[in-house]
Amino acid sequence: MFDEYSVKALLEAGADVNLKTTEENTALGEILGYMKDNYFDFNKIPLIEELLKLLLKSGLKINDTIDKKGNTAFIKACESINRNKLSNGKTLAAVVAKFLLKENCDANSTNLDGQTALMFLCASHGGEAQDLQIQVLEAGADIEAMDKNGETPLMYAARNRNLNIGKEMAELLFDFGDPKLEHVNNEGKSALEIATDLNNEEFVKFLLTKM
């Protein structure tokens, strides 16, 4: 997989780097598809970065959607950040996400469900997700964004399965502004009520200090 020479040959022959399949997938989406590959290893990361640079040089539209759900590559990478961690804790998704951020991708793009990259990161766990959350917030991610269910990044953090990381994600949101603590979703529940329902005591205690 990841045949750099073939990619170069195709691009030199005039291949459309933004061409989509019937499933709305693109070349960039195919790279992200290897997140399911259990044989992907750390040594291939430099090759991935070179391929991404090649695609970008050939006119890659980094903010284009890559699937029928309306996800951009950046959203998809952040949504998949926990998959197939390498022995050093790195993930292919994080490699792609960080590359796209460096190239000034739209940190506030939404999919068809109104979800942003920040929302997915707030629901994720592990050091890579936390590191990316900081970078996304520094890139101007909207901490008040709402998905089609009226859920905010703070609510995604409240649902984080790793209770400690969820709380840390919430703390970062408050560091960057007002994540709408009093807001309720389409079911009439606030982040505080969601955390209470999930018996997330530390998260509840933290939110109470912000009221």
Sequence positions of predicted segments:
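Ankyrin-repeat-protein effector appendages
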Residues: 186-189, 194-211
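Eukaryotic tandem repeat interaction scaffolds
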Residues: 79, 90-94, 106-139, 148-150
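Threonine-centered tandem repeat motifs in low-complexity domains
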Residues: 26, 72, 116-119, 152-155
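Ankyrin repeat A-helix N-terminal signature
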Residues: 1-3, 30-47, 76-93, 120-129, ...
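Ankyrin repeat boundary/linker residues
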Residues: 21, 66-67, 111, 147, ...
